[in-house]
Amino acid sequence: MLPTIALIGRPNVGKSTLFNRLLRKKRAITHDMPGITRDRIYAEGNYNGVHYALIDTGGLVMESDNNSEEFQGDIFEQAREAIEEAQALILVVDGRTGITQLDEQVAAYIRQSNKPILLLVNKVDGSELEATATADFHALGFEMMAVSAEHGFNLLELREKVADMALATGIEYEEEDEEAKGLKIAMLGRPNAGKSSMVNALTGEERVIVSDVAGTTRDSVDVTFESGGKIYTFVDTAGVRRRTNITDTIERFSVVRALRSSTKADITVMVVDALAGITKQDKRLLEYLLREAVPFIIAVNKIDLVSKSERNLLREGFERALRMAHHVPVVYTSCISKSGLGGILPLASKLKAECSLRISTGQLNRIMKEIIEKHQPPVVKRRRAKFKYMTQADDEPPTFIFFINDEKLIKSSYHRFLENRLRKILNVKHAPLNIVFRSTFRAKEDIVHK
């Protein structure tokens, strides 16, 4: 278990920038626009061997303000849960603007928690400004410290203070290995396809904000849970739009992280809106996942909104549209009725097992001999490819190298034949399968056919 500290405050006081500086890496999205952090974001910090969990929360707004009304209640609920989870709190305020009524309201609210609170006056760019910037905040009655997350003033002292706060909780850190997170599953798809609803339905809790406004999830949110005696971690990613539709820098950052999450996770679930069908952007996402050899499942969501009489036609349409991803499993789901959701986790586990496949060189060469004897490669320009031997170069995904006299003699149709035969013999139904042909008569870069 980790001692947990939560960053709390009104919008645009620099919580996410402080979060990143304390962690020394860019984990939360930062920008001068209120409401950027909507879900609570977790990460592990470490200073001089003191480990702790840090939670970044959305800016608390007590009254309706312009267009923030849609997220007020949800952000407040996420912050409230973070306060309950944490053993200590850091109230972040803006030293440039001075104390505001909203600061006082937030302070009054978190004081009720009876937890240790550090008042952090941010945006103080030097010691000469410290006395003036902090003067008004003494009235709040908390232990206080002045910093500048942007320019680094007092950051070393802050890291030491946060480590002291973690030690003061009395919670002893127990190191977790990657196995503690279990199977990591990234959720990927266009905005408002239902990714967050699916995470909540599968985990059984309202962990990720759900709204019918596209773009609610702007950052990757990790959710670890147990199901059927197995541990899973969902990474609920921001929706991915066409680049021409990404109108602000915030969403650009989120899209990059969403795509990165899909390649770092064990398995990706690509969520598609049943009503919208396979859009151009969905096809681009498919091409990206196939190109990167990402093991993934396609979840056609909101199937409950399609009439029963039209579902067969819808399935036929999806089958035609997904021919390029013939090996990828497709499930039809509804987060409202829970239809189809029960198959996702077992399918993800099976897909992970397929990706981890390791076959000995001896067994592979017996398989190769059997395949080639039954179906010789076609003659190309009076020459036929001669297979010398094969080996497995990697797993996750399985990658096999065929050593032949000249890789130019392999046609795409024969490559597909070899892939299909290997899938059947090795029982690799859904995982990506990389096949490399390497010429033995001269040194040359590998040519990979996926």
Curated annotation (Swiss-Prot):
Family annotation (PANTHER family): GTPASE DER
Gene Ontology molecular-function annotations: ATP hydrolysis activity; GTP binding
Span of domain KH-like: 357-441
Residues holding GTP 2: 189-196, 236-240, 301-304
Known partners and oligomeric status: Associates with the 50S ribosomal subunit.
Name recorded for this polypeptide: GTPase Der
Domain of life: Bacteria
Family annotation (InterPro entries): AAA+_ATPase, G_ENGA, GTP-bd, GTPase_Der, KH_dom-like, KH_dom-like_a/b, P-loop_NTPase, Small_GTP-bd
Function: GTPase that plays an essential role in the late steps of ribosome biogenesis.
SUPFAM superfamilies: P-loop containing nucleoside triphosphate hydrolases (SSF52540)
Keyword GTP-binding: yes
Annotated EngA-type G domain residues: 3-170, 183-356
PROSITE patterns: G_ENGA
Entry's family note: Belongs to the TRAFAC class TrmE-Era-EngA-EngB-Septin-like GTPase superfamily. EngA (Der) GTPase family.
GO terms classed as biological process: ribosome biogenesis
